[in-house]
């Protein structure tokens, strides 16, 4: 039998610890002991007769319509969201368009919770999820729940700029953990925490780690199972809460084999789930992981529905925060998404995720092949990623032909970037992702295979190669 | 010619002043001086081919279908959101489902800005709007933009509990301004600010006022034009930023005439707009008003789309906050809403708002008539509201038959509430809305005419009258 999670309430921020429930939310559940329908004149909920959307429909791909050899190939199905329904497994507009609980509509929440159980099955009792208005909001809520102004937070040495922009205005110092090509180093994390000197850092020892373990942004690296276990053990040793930010989790891939093509692996849903790298959540016996899931990379960014999974303490405090920060995710989104998920079912959704996995594998292979073909090998180096949507590559600074100009790394990167844009290719500069600019001594660029058309990859990389050849001894 | 707004940057919080734009957002706009299409390998935007929603449709009421005497009476129209479109006035799914600007999709934003101009026409140059994930998020963003932990904020003596729950965990002291039946008192505001003693209050003089000017929650009161002008002048005198929270603005009504019916006034859109009480925004020559608008009461709470209107400084800082707090409103919501608004046009939307106005007037009249009929006049007193969805009424404490028990106001209200629920009617207790419990010496209840069916009003109020008669000398 699974154990109870640890009491980790000492991690709550002043803001979070002081949150209270609105009396109006609680009172909506009032019941009479008599057999009588309660007429509510309590909460200011508009009568659904004033909702001007009376039905919604969406065209979605039929299950396996994405497979060329399927009898459903190319087929679209229509799913409907009716105004009202007496079926308990329908989320009607009269509910979806109304004020809802901060945790999201029950039916969609149940679907996402069951999905989370299938994939991660957290090893303690009482875990739950809260739906949010997306991963961005998850992070804002989690940071405000756990940190006070003046705290420090552990992050990967290169990290997602918007996450850093969420942290710094809250008064947090971002402490970079060293990385190699396979993600961040447990030894570096242990070293920082073991030798923390609150006086010289000007803040108490960090108690929160923010990480993108799979297909990390920007480096594309994925932490191995062994590292994950070491890191979790370190989190226990140093009493750290792990914010596991996993938008790219389902974009896991087979190893790159040097070809601009990919096999559409005919594996079962069970095999697909089994091959996914174990998450921190799946090994979280203490309840010290807050996992943030997103639909942005696997359904659509515009859905603005994400969720976080955690132990009851963080769920309850997170719910109080969500109620006053965002109220709830869009009911229009939730209505359409639930209709789609219900139509597909858990298995149909896993089929879709396999399709996404295959599509990104193909895209990665195309982009890597273009890089292998066009980039000058004498100055560019990179590791083929096995997850995510990014390839991170170093450009050898020692071969820069204008070294006499004494430019900084950001200056060189900006100059190369401007020339690349002028030649018709946009990409991201390494310095945008550097947590501590004082220790930035290598030139990096990040390219993504998520967006451009496949036939554009060669053109884009050839253009960039030309820019490099003008600036580096190749 | 309208003037420039004042420089009010000294009002920004530490958090807000330190926000920076993500470099990735800026670089998406990179352009080449050559006549060349830029292939972007920069931002991690999924290719729209992976968005599983290929088209959305919604059934919405045809313009004036809500009028019994219209040729469109009862008619529904279908509006569609296609996957892609070359029309510049269509918001397609390929855009709506993608990552967007924090300010919202341009077309919907333009519609709401034009609507704001028609209604309020702010009297300075450069005002703008940002779409948010709803009014709740507007308030969270505004509070974090303007206040630091330890600050005080002016609020109405009775106020919206969720707003107070947004403020207090941020470390704000809520300073109640005295009210009468017509809203809060300018003299009380001036008195507090003129005599502010930072030492005894333990915080600097407030520089932010939070108010619900129209159909205030919970009191239903509406500030007169004269009071609004006085308050704006006081805001200038004491250098106050006004957070104008206006979810009930369009629920303005003619005076109650003692009848459970209402005339569906055949007035033009121009007359409708002209009769709306002037907002603080409409008199904001300095740019010191942040107006928060909501679709929750006039379209649907589940839309989770709101917007705030302010001068450029607050728009730019608010955008930086929205990007890291919520990213943007749901694109699925925005797609459906824009299709509806485009179909209706500005004039059609005003027709809809007149319908909402009429419907709420009818509901208010029904509920007031039920109250006039059933509530014991010797203990209950109330003022018919001219806006909003709430009626606030006092129950004379001096007639409480258990006065010897020495119960507090909240204890009496809770007891009455529990008995009411047991009898099958739910309503809200006055003490839930009290900002300073130390000065709570009157019994109040709040009822809403927004939700229940018209034929339930009599039953509900009769039940509550019975509870009062058991507890008060009537």
Curated annotation (Swiss-Prot), chains A, B:
Pfam families: Aminotran_1_2. The keyword Metal-binding does not apply. GO terms for molecular function: 2-aminoadipate transaminase activity; aromatic-amino-acid transaminase activity; pyridoxal phosphate binding. It catalyses: an aromatic L-alpha-amino acid + 2-oxoglutarate = an aromatic oxo-acid + L-glutamate. Its cofactor is pyridoxal 5'-phosphate. Its main location: cytoplasm. It is found in: Cytoplasm. The keyword Transferase applies. Keywords: Aminotransferase, Cytoplasm, Pyridoxal phosphate, Transferase. Its EC number is 2.6.1.57. GO terms for biological process: aromatic amino acid family catabolic process; lysine biosynthetic process via aminoadipic acid; tyrosine biosynthetic process. Belongs to the class-I pyridoxal-phosphate-dependent aminotransferase family. Has aromatic amino acid transaminase activity. This is Aromatic amino acid aminotransferase C56E4.03. It comes from Schizosaccharomyces pombe (strain 972 / ATCC 24843).
């Amino acid at each position: 039998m699974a154990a109870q999670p640890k009491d980790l309430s000492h991690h709550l921020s002043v803001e979070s610890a002081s949150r209270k429930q609105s009396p109006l939310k609680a009172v909506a559940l009032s019941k009479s002991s008599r057999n009588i329908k309660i007429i509510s004149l309590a909460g200011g909920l508009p009568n659904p007769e004033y909702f001007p959307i009376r039905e919604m429909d969406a065209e979605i791909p039929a299950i396996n319509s994405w497979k060329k050899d399927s009898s459903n190939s190319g087929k679209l199905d229509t799913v409907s969201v009716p105004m009202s329904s007496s079926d308990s497994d329908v989320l009607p507009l009269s509910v979806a368009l109304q004020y809802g609980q901060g945790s999201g509509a029950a039916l969609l929440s149940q679907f996402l919770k069951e999905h989370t159980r299938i994939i991660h099955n957290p090893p303690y009792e009482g875990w739950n999820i809260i739906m949010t208005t997306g991963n961005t909001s998850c992070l804002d809520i989690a940071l405000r729940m756990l940190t006070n102004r003046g705290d420090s937070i552990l992050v990967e040495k290169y990290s997602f700029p918007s996450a850093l922009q969420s942290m710094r205005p809250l008064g947090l110092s971002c402490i970079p953990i060293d990385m190699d090509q396979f993600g961040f180093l447990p030894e570096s994390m242990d070293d920082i925490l073991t030798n923390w000197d609150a006086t010289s850092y000007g803040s108490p020892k960090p108690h929160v780690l923010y990480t993108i373990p799979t297909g990390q942004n920007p480096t594309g690296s994925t932490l191995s199972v062994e590292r994950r276990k070491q890191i979790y053990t370190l989190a226990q040793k140093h009493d750290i809460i792990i914010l596991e930010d996993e938008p790219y989790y389902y974009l896991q891939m087979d190893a790159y084999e040097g070809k601009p093509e990919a096999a559409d692996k005919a594996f079962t849903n069970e095999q697909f789930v089994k091959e996914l790298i174990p998450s921190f959540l799946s090994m979280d016996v203490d309840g010290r992981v807050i996992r943030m899931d997103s639909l942005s990379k696997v359904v659509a960014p515009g859905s603005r529905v994400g969720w976080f999974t955690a132990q009851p303490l963080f769920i309850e405090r997170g719910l109080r925060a969500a109620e006053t920060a965002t109220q709830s995710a869009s009911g229009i989104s939730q209505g359409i998404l639930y209709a789609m998920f219900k139509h597909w079912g858990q298995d149909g959704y896993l089929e879709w995720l396999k399709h996404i996995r295959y599509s990104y594998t193909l895209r990665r292979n195309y982009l890597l092949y273009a890089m292998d073909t066009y980039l000058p090998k004498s100055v560019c180096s990179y590791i083929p990623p096995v997850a995510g949507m990014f390839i991170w590559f170093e450009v050898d600074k020692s071969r820069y032909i204008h070294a006499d100009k004494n430019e900084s790394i950001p200056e060189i990167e900006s100059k190369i970037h401007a020339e690349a844009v002028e030649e018709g290719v946009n990409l991201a500069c390494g310095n945008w992702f550097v947590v501590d600019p004082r220790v930035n001594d290598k030139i990096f660029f990040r390219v993504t295979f998520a967006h451009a058309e496949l036939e554009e990859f060669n053109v884009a990389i050839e253009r960039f190669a030309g820019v490099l050849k003008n600036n580096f001894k190749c």
